[in-house]
């Protein structure tokens, strides 16, 4: 990866219908504020999307980092491993154990 490009990191996790609002709140008010407190200043943006299924809710997270070094600061040297705090694991049914990484080539604002 070109180290000067912004990096997009994606990951999915699934939880019960009942735990979905709990997990969403946890992401917004605990997980990502804690990441920022730990000094991961290169995390620029987090998008949280959901897809409702019959018995569960799928969460799709898209994180934007300024560099691959910031991704490593966030997730460690083995940065392809998923970052899932223990409190989040308790409310998730299952989750991807790895994250995907992409170089952001262009962002079009159409409004």
Spans of model-derived segments:
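Short, well-ordered beta-strand segments in beta-rich or mixed alpha/beta enzyme
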Residues: 7-14, 45-79
């Amino acid at each position: 990866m070109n180290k000067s490009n912004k990096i997009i990191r994606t990951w999915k996790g699934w939880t019960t219908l009942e735990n979905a609002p709990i997990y969403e709140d946890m992401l917004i008010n605990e997980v990502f504020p804690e990441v920022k407190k730990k000094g991961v200043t290169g995390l620029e943006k987090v998008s949280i999307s959901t897809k409702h299924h019959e018995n569960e809710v799928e969460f799709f997270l898209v994180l934007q980092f300024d560099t691959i070094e910031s991704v490593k600061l966030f997730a460690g040297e083995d940065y392809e491993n998923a970052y899932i705090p223990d409190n989040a694991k308790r409310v998730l049914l299952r989750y991807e154990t790895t994250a995907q990484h992409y170089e952001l080539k262009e962002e079009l604002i159409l409004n």
